[in-house]
């Protein structure tokens, strides 16, 4: 008999003949088809293959998940390290701000110290100015005092242009032919000699101006027509032995009409220590009175190459000339 689970399609039905003619019983033989027998194992093998592939896929997914988890763990560790470093930097900055912070009253202390130094500097300047005459032209170069027992302890003439204008006699033809007098300078180590002028050549140094007697009101007060024919005594050499004669009328009332040599003499007698090195420079550039009044600190520094301190002093003296403190307006 055929089992209930098997179908007629998978079974081969065969009739079995009987030898009894009187018996109506019919016998059948059932056999399984060979194709069905061979087909069933293939189905089982395909199912097992699918199961293995599924397990392999699951394993791959789990492996990738593990890799991702490990990467996240490493990233968390790196983030923790970065946070610790940032917090350390912040603590260091906060500590440096608190340690370098100025204490209370520091500003007031520095202000008092600066004020004290300023007072000391003002006292030094007052002491320094007490050693110089009020007629001193230079604010930085003190004028040495003469001794009380000096024979030439007389009032010193200052650098005033009106004295030279007042000293020029207009009616005397003899004096009109003599060179113009120069500015008297303050030299305590040189003795002043009497000065006489005539038509002939001047005795003494031929390259420098002669200095008059400072005891008189002017150089020409000691001169009279009675002394024109008198013998001319010898005169000591001037402190500026290398200077040339200043031409007549070169030093006039206003500095804008000065010649180059008058400007050079002005530099030497104003501040010899600071301005004497500029003599050759002024002569080479032929700087006269007009050019002197037009000089500025920028021109002196950039174009003439003068040092800063010397340029400041010279600009100060030029401002004094412009204000009319050394000549009459």
Curated annotation (Swiss-Prot):
- Tissue note: Highly expressed in testis and pancreas. Preferentially expressed in the germ stem cells of testis.
What cellular-component terms does GO give this entry?
A: nucleus
What GO terms in the biological process aspect are recorded for it? negative regulation of DNA-templated transcription
Q: Which UniProt keywords apply?
A: Nucleus, Phosphoprotein, Repressor, Transcription, Transcription regulation
Q: Sorted alphabetically, which SUPFAM superfamilies does this protein's record hold?
A: SAM/Pointed domain
Entry-linked Pfam families: SAM_1
Q: Where is the SAM domain?
A: 258-325
Q: Name one GO molecular function term.
A: chromatin binding
Top-rank taxon:
Eukaryota
Compartments (UniProt record): Nucleus
- Chain residue ranges for the region called Disordered: 125-194
- Name-wise, this protein is Sex comb on midleg-like protein 1
Q: What is the source species?
A: Macaca mulatta (Rhesus macaque)
């Amino acid at each position: 008999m055929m089992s209930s689970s098997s179908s007629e399609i998978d079974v081969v039905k065969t009739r079995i003949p009987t030898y009894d003619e009187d018996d109506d019983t019919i016998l059948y033989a059932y056999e399984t088809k060979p194709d069905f027998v061979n087909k069933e194992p293939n189905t089982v093998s395909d199912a097992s293959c699918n199961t293995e592939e599924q397990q392999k896929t699951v394993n791959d997914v789990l492996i990738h998940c593990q890799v991702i988890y490990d990467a996240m763990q490493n990233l968390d560790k790196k983030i923790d390290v970065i946070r610790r470093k940032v917090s350390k930097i912040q603590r260091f900055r906060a500590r440096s701000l608190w340690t370098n912070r100025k204490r209370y009253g520091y500003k007031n202390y520095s202000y008092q110290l600066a004020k004290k130094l300023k007072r000391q500097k003002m006292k030094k300047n007052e002491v320094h100015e007490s050693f110089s005459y009020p007629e001193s032209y230079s604010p930085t170069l003190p004028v040495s005092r003469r001794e009380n027992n000096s024979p030439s302890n007389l009032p010193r003439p200052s650098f005033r242009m009106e004295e030279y204008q007042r000293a020029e006699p207009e009616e005397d033809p003899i004096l009109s032919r003599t060179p113009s007098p120069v500015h008297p300078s303050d030299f305590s180590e040189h003795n002043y000699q009497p000065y006489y002028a005539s038509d002939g050549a001047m005795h003494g140094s031929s390259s420098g101006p002669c200095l008059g007697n400072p005891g008189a009101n002017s150089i020409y007060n000691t001169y009279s027509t009675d002394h024109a024919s008198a013998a001319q005594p010898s005169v000591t050499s001037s402190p500026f032995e290398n200077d040339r004669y200043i031409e007549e009328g070169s030093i006039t009332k206003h500095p804008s009409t000065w010649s180059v040599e008058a400007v050079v003499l002005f530099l030497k007698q104003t501040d010899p220590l600071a301005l004497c090195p500029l003599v050759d420079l002024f002569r080479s550039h032929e700087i006269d009175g007009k050019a002197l009044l037009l000089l500025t600190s920028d021109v002196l520094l950039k174009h003439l190459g003068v040092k800063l301190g010397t340029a400041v002093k010279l600009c100060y003296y030029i401002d004094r000339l412009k204000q009319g403190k050394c000549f009459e307006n």
